[in-house]
């Protein structure tokens, strides 16, 4: 019997607006300052962040979140939660929702895993009520300034 081990990875960036349940997702092959910069740029473009629309993102202290090479787009402001406090991060409650479709499954190819995760992210994006129930803590700020179009 020949055993061939190899490892390939996909990483999932998840962004959530707890008050609305809106999510944005980005699957990537790397987590690094450059990867996070690309994720922030993609996110800013999707939500229209810029000079007239500002977003606050709450992040943990992961190395790629604080990388010296990180490029933060205009309109995005990063706020870092205290160390070892995942309970303060609403996005942490997204991961069990994603994991439930991949747990205890054998994927023959990385693309198969990517397809399953992408489909799950699409399902979650189309079910903001489910996301909101999991991420909108009673103490989390609500929107006090409705979007003006």
Language-model segment annotations:
Residues 1-5, 74-93:
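RNase H-like polynucleotidyl transferase catalytic core
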Residues 40, 51-65, 89:
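Acidic/histidine-rich, metal-coordinating catalytic segments
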Residues 49, 57, 62, 78-81, ...:
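Single, function-defining residue in the core of a domain
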